[in-house]
């Protein structure tokens, strides 16, 4: 947000400067129907502390409270919209007070074309907050006039016309996630069929086609985490080919999850008891999947030790 004119406005209005804020501060505003709620949800999902529908005059008070909070709040997002009615006119003065106090912040302005905004309001069967007794377009026009100066001075203007909910959430994540685009988190879980399927599994691989180390006396006491069992399992005919093909089959799934803004999935690998074959294959599968960009993998063994 530009500082010079805002700072002079703050001085003229006599607003008290706030204590310097250590948290990263993002002010989210924009046109009604442009996706503020979706943006707020996406920010909250990725570690931001989100305050919605805050009157602009309370920005300084909130910053002061956060600066004295006993528990650190590293990233704070504040959503402001025209439902604050008359108080919205004070937003530049409030932002000016923050700038004058040395608080670093960014302003995200969400926008969309008139046609898209009208369609969204009609689909939601709700009136525009500024239309009064007129048309939705009348409310949009009034809001554009009210927000034009703020839009022009915002740090980021994001046109959401071409986004659905998932696409907008992904765009927000890529803009404001601490580490850029969020990773897809995969949990590769070994299990034993005799104990039942994992209820939270998205995909299940059945590896009972592999010769069972249980019937090899020297391997029976060991598990798939031990090298002798792992070598026995992975060197069996067709196993490495199976793992490679399974990973290839998951590639379009991983891409689709990213497009749909899905961040978690569980891939279950099962054998009879969850001790030998599934454990070894789950470890190998995890190594392969971890090589993909923007993927983090954890490996768990649900039934290891149950026997």
From Swiss-Prot:
Protein residues bound to ATP: 30-37
Domain of life: Bacteria
Keywords of this entry: ATP-binding, GTP-binding, Nucleotide-binding
InterPro entries named among the record's database cross-references: P-loop_NTPase, RapZ-like, RapZ-like_N, RapZ_C
Family matches, as SUPFAM superfamilies: P-loop containing nucleoside triphosphate hydrolases
Binding site for GTP: 81-84
One Gene Ontology MF term: GTP binding
PANTHER family: RNASE ADAPTER PROTEIN RAPZ
Sequence similarity: Belongs to the RapZ-like family.
Its biological purpose: Displays ATPase and GTPase activities.
Alphabetized HAMAP family for the sequence: RapZ_like
Protein name (record): Nucleotide-binding protein Achl_1824
């Amino acid at each position: 947000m530009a500082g010079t004119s805002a700072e002079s406005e703050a001085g003229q209005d006599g607003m008290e400067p706030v204590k310097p804020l250590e948290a990263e501060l993002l002010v989210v505003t924009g046109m009604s129907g442009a996706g503020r709620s979706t943006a707020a949800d996406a920010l909250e999902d990725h570690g931001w502390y989100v305050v919605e529908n805050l009157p602009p005059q309370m920005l300084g008070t909130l910053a002061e409270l956060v600066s004295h909070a006993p528990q650190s709040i590293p990233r704070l997002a504040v959503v402001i919209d025209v439902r604050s009615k008359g108080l919205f006119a004070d937003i530049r003065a409030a932002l000016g007070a923050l700038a004058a106090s040395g608080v670093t912040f960014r302003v995200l302005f969400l926008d969309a074309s008139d046609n898209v905004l009208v369609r969204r309001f009609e689909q939601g069967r709700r009136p525009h907050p500024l239309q009064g007794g007129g048309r939705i377009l009348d409310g949009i026009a009034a809001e554009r006039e009210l927000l034009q100066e703020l839009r022009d001075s915002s740090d980021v203007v994001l046109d959401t016309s071409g986004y659905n909910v998932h696409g907008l959430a992904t765009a927000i994540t890529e803009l404001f996630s601490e580490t850029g685009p969020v990773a897809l988190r995969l949990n590769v879980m070994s299990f034993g069929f005799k104990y039942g399927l994992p209820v939270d599994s998205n995909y299940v691989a059945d590896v009972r086609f592999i010769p069972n180390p249980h019937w090899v006396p020297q391997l029976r006491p060991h598990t798939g985490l031990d090298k002798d069992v792992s070598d026995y399992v992975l060197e069996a005919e067709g196993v490495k080919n199976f793992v490679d093909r399974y990973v290839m089959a998951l590639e379009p799934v991983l891409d689709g999850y990213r497009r749909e803004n899905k961040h978690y999935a569980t891939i279950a690998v099962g054998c009879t008891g969850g001790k030998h074959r599934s454990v070894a294959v789950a470890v190998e599968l995890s190594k392969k999947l971890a090589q993909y960009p923007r993927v983090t993998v954890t490996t768990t063994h649900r039934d290891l030790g149950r026997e």
